[in-house]
Amino acid sequence: MSPISPPEPEKQPEEPQEPKTEPETPQNEQEGDYYNLMDVSVKSTPEIDNIIANLKFSKFHLEVDPDETGSSIVIFGSSKSYKTTLLKRILKDYYSEDTITLLSAPNVHAKIYNDLPKEILRTDQYKPEIVKAMYYINKKTDNKYPFVIALDDVIDKKNDGDLEKLFLTLRNAKISVIILLQNIQLLKSTSRGNANIVIFRKFNQANVIEDYVMKMYLQNFYPFRDLKMADKVALYMKLTNNHHFFVLDVINNKLTIHMEPELRE
């Protein structure tokens, strides 16, 4: 007698499967409207390409005269964005041997500073006492000496009162300041608001460009003013990724763009 096989289990009806669909692309990520802003590569649009093709680059020139009055210059940009290269050009071209120049940087003895004029004083620490001494000297000599203090990535003095005075009042004592920072928030808002010239170089984060560069400074200037925010940021990244840079002359309410190769003349 052959063994009896157990009955096959009853087939359960299959649960209805939801149709598989690809996740929808967010509106700001549609083809031609999406920019991978966290990468070096930035997608473009015909509008952005047209703006770039018609941009007029200006010869680099700053409206500063240290013999007449002090100035305040800020250079913002990520690491490796040629901020120090530009600083050296400014010191050589605008602050003569008659200007007493002090450079303060944590790595002040690095090779990048080797080609600066020997007359430039150097220190690896910013000290408020130096600012006070400059002010005292010019107070006693009727503003005889033009001074300039250059601070390269001095990141821990945001709330220093004497640093703030360099932007607020000490320009009247013929004391100028040039400060280089990787983060716009590292400069106190009152100092940012009183800078004469603000220079913008490359940033790596799209949100930084949107929240600080655009919303605080550039969004209402040509070539950005008529673009939606994603395109403003993309245009900024596309230009500054080539190390071009923007100069905002606050006093004259003027924005210009400059080509990096000019700095290598």
Language-model features: locations:
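Intrinsically disordered, low-structural-confidence terminal and linker regions
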Residues: 1-9, 32-36
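Acidic, proline-/serine-/threonine-rich low-complexity intrinsically disordered repeat tracts
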Residues: 7-29
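N-terminal pre-Walker A segment at the start of P-loop NTPase domains
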Residues: 26-62
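P-loop NTPase motor core of the ASCE superfamily
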Residues: 58-77, 86, 145, 162-167, ...
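Conserved P-loop NTPase motor cores
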Residues: 73-92, 105-109, 121-224
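AAA+/P-loop NTPase substrate/partner-engagement loops
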Residues: 96-115
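Short, conserved catalytic or adaptor-binding loops enriched in Gly and charged residues
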Residues: 113-115, 191, 238
